């Protein structure tokens, strides 16, 4: 199947310079390999509010999986490569960096300096989750969103652990609430149990399921049409 990067270069890249404002999109591994549709939708939304979308010169995995498994040296190499591209985007191209993954954004903003000892103070505030970026534009009155009025649905929102640490769940929730005819249920979220790569490991399966049990019960009880979250591993 086609990666998001391949799709973007073939179908979207050529038209992005037509917009008056621009951002760089840190898509991450999940969008690139597992769910390109989310990346395509992100491009559509940003284009709709007048922003051209560009890829970073070189994007590596944010490194969170390496950090979680103690592979600090490898994670540091990837972080340094990402920050080189981020600095080029921000300082040379004058483009802030947005992402759709709370985990990737938290890692790049907070875990690079705290866990890897890499100074990102010069760019940290220009690395942002897309929902916060869009919310700020709406609050400033710079853009307006147009919605279809023929969609009625019940959505349950789960706050991921990294989103909780960022303190940015408010922005995703506010955007969902702004959609007409959406009945939004904000779950009393605890960890889903996957905990990065922890829950992928066979020996951790029972513990992982136990951690997520409360969240799973809530999701079943609210019987929503969709469950929304900003984290790929929670999904």
Please identify what each model-predicted range represents:
Residues 1-235:
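Iron-sulfur cluster-binding electron-transfer modules in prokaryotic oxidoreductases
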